[in-house]
Every structure is written in structure tokens, then in C-alpha cells.
Amino acid sequence: AALKGLPRTGAARQIDALLERVSLTEVRRKKIIKLSGGMKRRVGIAQALLNDPEILILDEPTAGLDPGERVRFRNLLSEFAQERIVLISTHIVSDVEYIAAENAVMKAGKIIAQDTTEGLVKQIEAKVWQRNIPMEQLARWEYRLRVVNLRNEPDGTVTLRYLADAPQLPDSVPAQPRLEDLYLWLFPEEMEEAK
């Protein structure tokens, strides 16, 4: 608090309130090095909020967190986003889906898409397809299509989810688009690198 220039009189009260808000009251006397990754992230958020900033900027805030801590941290960020602007730079699309009311997608330093999550996802309606195929056909189609997901089925088949302007496999059906699909549509090079 002293490094933030807070007056000593109100600092203790503000620290207590923030520790409670980020669920760290029980570990307040522990050294930061002894805390889990998620707890360290919450300490960072509490430190950033000491001066009650209007804008909070976070880079990859949930990277490396286990699923439970990730959900807890996303919920915390959503709560803080109600009172201030929270800018998040991340490649973890699910974080954005659950936190952001408004999204901007940047490529090479330029905004290439901006809207609500629902508005962005609408941009790729009728570009996400799904088709169940026999396992032995997988290799044939996996490299010809922009496959975004494979799901093994109990009957030994595979459900392909892929991106295309029109269905590429007979009997393909439209699939409900997600924000991750939009990301892969806008950044096809990400899929090429994975092949």
C-alpha cells in the first residue's frame, strides 16, 4: 500500500476489504512465494485494485491455472468488470466468452473484428459444419478440411467439426458456432501450424 502512495490510515482497512473480495483473508500472513498460482494471481488483482483504477489491464490472466481456479478467477474478473473497464489480452478463448461483454479481435496490431460475443459468433453462422464419419476415413478428411474438433464416438466413428463457406462432406449439418470457431476462422494460420 505504501508503494501505491496510499495514506497509512485507510490502507489497512482497504487491504482487508480487498483480501476478502479476492478470498485471501485466510492466507493474509503467508509469504507470496508459498501461495498457489491462482492465489498469486488474486494477490496481483488485489494489488492492482488498491488505487481503485478505472481501467484494469491483464495479460493472459488465467494461463497455467487449473480448471477450478480458472473458473474462480474468471468470475472474479467478471465481478470487477461491472465497476470498471477490464482489458484482457489472451489466447484462451473460453475466458473471453465468459467474461467480456464487448470483444475486440486484433491481428498484426489492428482490430479486425469488434462486437459482443453473440455478434461475433453470428459472423460465422453457416460456416461451421459437423459430420460423423468412419474412423478409417479420418486421415483422408483431416488434412483436406479446416477441422476444429474431433470427437470419438462410442460406435467407433468420429464426429468432425470443421470450418468452410459451404459443406465439404456430403450429409454435413450446420453446427452451432462458438467464439473459438470465429478465432480459428480469422486466424487460419493457427490451424495450419497445428497440422
What are these regions (language model features)?
Residues 1-107:
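ABC transporter nucleotide-binding domains
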Residues 2-8, 129, 188-191:
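Non-catalytic alpha-helical coupling and interface elements of nucleotide-dependent molecular machines
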Residues 19, 74, 121, 180-184:
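Conserved protein kinase catalytic domain
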Residues 23, 44, 125, 187-188:
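A generic structural signal for secondary-structure junctions
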Residues 26, 135, 164-166:
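Non-catalytic surface loops within mature trypsin-like serine protease
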Residues 73-161:
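ABC transporter nucleotide-binding domain
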Residues 146-195:
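C-terminal coupling/interaction segments
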